[in-house]
Amino acid sequence: MATKLQDENTPCLAATPSEPRPTVLVFDSGVGGLSVYDEIRRLLPDLHYIYAFDNVAFPYGEKSETFIVERVVEIVTAVQQRYPLSLAVIACNTASTVSLPALREKFAFPVVGVVPAIKPAARLTANGVVGLLATRATVKRPYTHELIARFANECQIAMLGSAELVELAEAKLHGDSVSLEELRRILRPWLRMPEPPDTVVLGCTHFPLLRDELLQVLPEGTRLVDSGAAIARRTAWLLEHEAPDAKSTDANIAYCMAMTPGAEQLLPVLQRYGFETLEKLAV
């Protein structure tokens, strides 16, 4: 089912382009991937974008690795059957750390993953204390600890895993206000440190959506670092050098896995991001 919001307050969107454009899929378990998509679109505004989010299995942070791999491969396959893809971005840290090998083995187009921006954070920190704010799953993954050992072994890494922040980010996009008191409670382990992190890695794509609120709660001068801009640059390079010639003249489209009231409430948000319609993807 395709759903279109016909509302006088809906931002006007450009007509369907007549020139074929490379087709890029951005996928996440929820709406956090919109933060990555926004960075890519800023650098590459003239692509055909598909945004898919798994509102049936959200959040992925509490799911098994086997489930995540099978689910992500299934969803990307379903999108690929509808649109030949030039490139896919797995805009979910949890899914990226476990599903990229299976996706790259199955598909001929490039697949870009999202990993915590530990390397740039280690370069930016002045006091040597770097905070990693992520889901509990990302905090526990061996891959995360390998990144720390490789790029930040001279830093003190304060890791904080939270599923509640993911829910707060989703609620914010649905129009709910974010409780700063709740944020203070979640971040209390850092706020009580004698020397808190001066640089914080936003290790979940949902967390840039809470950037303003986090800056109000964290100590003044704290730097927030995420992977969005780096992913956009990587996407641009791959589209130029390695992506297949899969192009479309269709308008941007978003897919959910179930057309729930919550998904329908996201229509105004998705349209502001440039997605003309929202459809249920059969998987």
Curated annotation (Swiss-Prot):
GO molecular function, one term: glutamate racemase activity
PROSITE patterns, per the entry: ASP_GLU_RACEMASE_1, ASP_GLU_RACEMASE_2
Disulphide-bridged cysteine pairs: none
UniProt keyword terms in alphabetical order: Cell shape, Cell wall biogenesis/degradation, Isomerase, Peptidoglycan synthesis
EC number(s) stated in the UniProt entry for this protein: 5.1.1.3
Protein's UniProt keywords contain Cell wall biogenesis/degradation: yes
Catalytic activity: L-glutamate = D-glutamate
Class of enzymatic activity (EC top level): isomerase
Residues the entry annotates as binding substrate: 28-29, 60-61, 93-94, 205-206
Entry keyword Zinc-finger: no
Function: Provides the (R)-glutamate required for cell wall biosynthesis.
Designated name of the protein: Glutamate racemase
Gene label: murI
